[in-house]
Swiss-Prot record:
Cellular localisation: Plastid, Chloroplast
SUPFAM superfamilies referenced in this protein's UniProt entry, alphabetically: RuBisCO, small subunit
InterPro entries: RuBisCO_ssu, RuBisCO_ssu_dom, RuBisCO_ssu_sf
UniProt xrefs under Gene3D superfamilies: Ribulose bisphosphate carboxylase, small subunit
Protein source organism: Ectocarpus siliculosus
GO CC annotations on file: chloroplast
Protein name as it appears in the record: Ribulose bisphosphate carboxylase small subunit
Keywords, sorted A to Z: Calvin cycle, Carbon dioxide fixation, Chloroplast, Photorespiration, Photosynthesis, Plastid
Amino acid sequence: MRVTQGCFSFLPDLSDDQIKQQVSYAMSKGWAVSVEWTDDPHPRNSYWELWGLPLFDVKDPAAVMYELAECRKVNPEGYIKINAFDASIGTESCVMSFIVQRPITEPGFYLERNEIHGRNIQYTISSYAVQARPSGDRY
């Protein structure tokens, strides 16, 4: 099951040249770029691990591509995404985010159903990867 989070998630994976073009676009807008990774792809897991520091004031996409390459070396089977943050007054938010690497196999999610008080049914989704292995050993 292909995880679909962020921009371009329904398109084929971006090449490094396409990633660099998106980073250049973000930098041309004055947005700060950061690299994040995770091994827990749950849709509500919006706080991924930050790789290094956000690249504030960096104007060269090559620096971001270097950090991405280093993150890929350390996390060869994890999810990696690039975020762009607009710090301008009135926005102050993540304005672009897209996955740049994913595991070769993505096991997907399962639906858990629990009966709670008053015969109410509570549903939640969980990742097969998270259930099967501890953090850091999932892919």
